[in-house]
Amino acid sequence: MFSLSLIQPRLRISEIPVTQSYKSPTICYSSDSRTKREEQRHVRLPGFRLVSGKRASFDSGFSGFKGENVNQDDSSSFDSERVDYALLAEWLQSSNGMRLIKRIHAMALKCFDDQVIYFGNNLISSCVRLGDLVYARKVFDSMPEKNTVTWTAMIDGYLKYGLEDEAFALFEDYVKHGIRFTNERMFVCLLNLCSRRAEFELGRQVHGNMVKVGVGNLIVESSLVYFYAQCGELTSALRAFDMMEEKDVISWTAVISACSRKGHGIKAIGMFIGMLNHWFLPNEFTVCSILKACSEEKALRFGRQVHSLVVKRMIKTDVFVGTSLMDMYAKCGEISDCRKVFDGMSNRNTVTWTSIIAAHAREGFGEEAISLFRIMKRRHLIANNLTVVSILRACGSVGALLLGKELHAQIIKNSIEKNVYIGSTLVWLYCKCGESRDAFNVLQQLPSRDVVSWTAMISGCSSLGHESEALDFLKEMIQEGVEPNPFTYSSALKACANSESLLIGRSIHSIAKKNHALSNVFVGSALIHMYAKCGFVSEAFRVFDSMPEKNLVSWKAMIMGYARNGFCREALKLMYRMEAEGFEVDDYIFATILSTCGDIELDEAVESSATCYLETS
């Protein structure tokens, strides 16, 4: 957020004459270097004093005014002929409380019939600085004339305190008044507004006006890069970044963060290296963005180098940097390093504790996650929704049903049981612990059931051997208009395979094809397993052969399908083909083929299959 600077009059304090029991400064104004110094004007205001020999400000007592009512008669406290707008603007900038701001405003209303615009601008900016947006808006609305600085100050004030809707409404009024876009700070405010509201088309129009007017400096161009990055327009962000004659840490961080968020981790790492080569030291936001890229790309070695840079260059290691480091190590499978970072952090908040609990739960260390959660509770830290989801997953992974039910009771007490993510995880927990009835009750009580909650129920029933219930839930899900995801298809096809429900399996195959889900390797593997389990090996191979991508699961499903249906030679051929394409044949596959091919000469079968594979190659 780029804050507006106040308009400062050129003042010079020349002497401080003593009048009665208080001091009153003599202010000299210099409007032009070619003119002579104007006559000194003595201003008599109580409590005015010189601060550090440089600026004038109000004494905290300021007993000359008896109230904050702007209509109150205080004419006895000052001489209106000796008060100047420039002096009042200077006092506004020196004031540290709204009480003084209102008194200065009252003085201006009493001394002058008309307010000049720049005094009103300073008054608005001072109110914004002290957080009184209501009074700032009253001043704004009461100004008979406004310029671009006036509108900018008010819009910037709303943005500063997160009131994007009010800022946007004010901008619409700005456009209706037909004021031209000429102020660089206004462009910065509008780009920040468009960034927060993801108003891409409006932001592009602002960009067009920037080009038309010819506005451009480092802050404006960085705001433009940040706007495109926040709207997910990576190409436009990079184009705007490349056109910058001068770059700063903010612009580098914006493009690195955009690359990381859009899944271009390698590109983000390359940009980060370029930033260092241009001698820019990253800040904590840059570090968090590049660590996210390392997490997604599993770039552990580079992540360690970033960690070393943070330590050596003494980059601010707040909870966000520490949490990003923990997340990077956890997603790269280095739980011990993740725990070391956690233990070395001097400050930990709910986000930090949630991150370490989620990391242990995700990597299968459920007991450790539960232990950390108990420590967190003893330290009286309030868990958020993500903490609850993580600890429920930890309970499910180790079968801690009792603790899960305790958490469920606490969830109901805190009135968060209708949260779809918490509800879906509760469904998964109860299914994992064999409590399908409790899982169904949770599902029924959810006000809106999304694909995650339905999939949790279907997967749970399928794993528990309740195939017919799983398929009924799939039917109900589709009737409610919820589109299945690849995990839903895989779970439902597993239920079809276990119950050998070929007709339903074919229907699911048709739906998956219609929704373009067949390209997913897990859906393809589940289809192979279903057709092979139902005895339709040729259809299983047709699915296998049409898969654009194969993994170990799909190879294994097809080989097992051949072997269990008595097609030993085909199984052996496929095993050799699998090995030739770089996949390791595990002992389970080999043992299955040996056990099912006992009625043929194995050496002859192996030799013929190998020869056949070499010929086809």
UniProtKB/Swiss-Prot annotation:
Residues 1-19 form a transit peptide. One of its GO terms (biological process) is RNA splicing. Disruption phenotype: Albino lethal phenotype with severe chloroplast development defects. Gene3D superfamilies: Tetratricopeptide repeat domain (1.25.40.10). The keyword Repeat applies. Transmembrane segments: none annotated. Keywords: Chloroplast, mRNA processing, Plastid, Repeat, RNA-binding, Transit peptide. The keyword Plastid applies. Interacts with MORF8/RIP1, MORF2/RIP2 and MORF9/RIP9. Required for proper chloroplast development. Involved in the regulation of plastid gene expression probably through regulation of plastid-encoded polymerase (PEP) dependent chloroplast transcription. Required for RNA editing of several chloroplastic transcripts, especially accD transcripts. Required for processing of the chloroplastic rpoA pre-mRNA. Required for the monocistronic rpoA transcript processing from the rpl23-rpl2-rps19-rpl22-rps3-rpl16-rpl14-rps8-rpl36-rps11-rpoA polycistron. Binds the intergenic sequence of rps11-rpoA for rpoA monocistronic RNA cleavage. This is Pentatricopeptide repeat-containing protein At4g18520, chloroplastic.
